[in-house]
């Protein structure tokens, strides 16, 4: 079997696996939440080959933009590459754990991490785009409120595509209303789970919120692609905005700390050197 055919078959096998039950779907979403910049079909293949991946890129991007080199013996993650110019072929990406930074000039991706001090700024920023949420609720519950609102706003646009694809799946034979209910609820829960997972929520605590009662009915590649593409494309701008807000908060906070040190006349003391060393150590983890 050609490698391309093998990877194509792997995608189909993985699609069948992740919709077996809620546990399998949540395992997939946990990986997808870290790789939200990738399209659904590529997320699926990365999950199949490296479910622990956190930040993937082509060898060209690692070399040319990040000045990182792939470790000897590292195995690339194969993805399907279909374009009219070159036909069907494979392309490869490598996880950040597969590379090392060149001395002095190498850098790693800046992977944001949400902490308690970020939550107020994040929710305020999201409310500017997605509308007000219940300020009596916890941050995680307000994210779920936003996710549900997004799903309700968009699922009807997706419904005709899903209706066209349901032949051969467990959705076949259902009327439009019931197909719509299944899409809306599964989409809402998928977006919610993705947002909470990416934000570091305790999924042991919040996992019970997501029944995913209908996930097994999206049991064809076509129906799952409608759901998976939508969940990814709708969660992605939310996560990008969260990341931007966290980085802005961190930059502002770091600037304040630097100004405070300068005002105290510590800019050229050993304490400042220690602070600079600490910042350099922290930056090693990020872009």
Indicate where each model-derived feature is located.
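N-terminal accessory/interface modules of nucleic-acid-binding and processing proteins
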Residues: 1-274, 278-279
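Single conserved hydrophobic/aromatic residue that forms the stacking wall/gate
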Residues: 277, 282-287
């Amino acid at each position: 079997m050609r490698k391309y055919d093998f990877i194509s078959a792997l995608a189909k096998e993985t699609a069948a696996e992740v919709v077996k039950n809620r546990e399998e779907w949540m395992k997939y979403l946990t990986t997808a939440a870290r790789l939200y910049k990738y399209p659904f079909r590529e997320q699926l293949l990365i999950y199949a080959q490296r479910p622990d991946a956190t930040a993937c890129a082509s060898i060209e991007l690692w070399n040319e933009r990040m000045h990182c080199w792939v470790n000897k013996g590292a195995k690339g993650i194969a993805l399907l590459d279909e374009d009219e110019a070159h036909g069907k072929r494979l392309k490869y990406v490598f996880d950040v754990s597969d590379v090392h930074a060149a001395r002095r000039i190498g850098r790693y991706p800046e992977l944001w991490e949400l902490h308690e001090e970020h939550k107020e700024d994040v929710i305020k920023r999201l409310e500017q785009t997605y509308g007000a949420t219940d300020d009596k609720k916890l941050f995680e519950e307000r994210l779920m409120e936003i996710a549900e609102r997004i799903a309700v706003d968009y699922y009807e646009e997706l419904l005709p595509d899903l209706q066209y694809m349901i032949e051969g799946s467990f959705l076949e034979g259902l009327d439009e209303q019931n197909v719509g209910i299944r899409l809306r609820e599964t989409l809402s829960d998928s977006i919610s789970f993705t947002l909470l997972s990416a934000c570091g929520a305790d999924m042991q605590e919040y996992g019970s919120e997501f029944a995913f009662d209908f996930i097994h009915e999206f049991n064809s590649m076509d129906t799952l692609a409608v759901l998976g593409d939508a969940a990814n494309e709708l969660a992605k701008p939310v996560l990008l905005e969260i990341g931007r807000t966290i980085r802005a908060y961190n930059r502002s906070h770091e600037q304040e700390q630097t100004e405070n040190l300068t005002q105290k006349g510590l800019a050229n003391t050993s304490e400042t050197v220690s602070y600079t060393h600490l910042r350099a150590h922290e930056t090693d983890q990020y872009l």
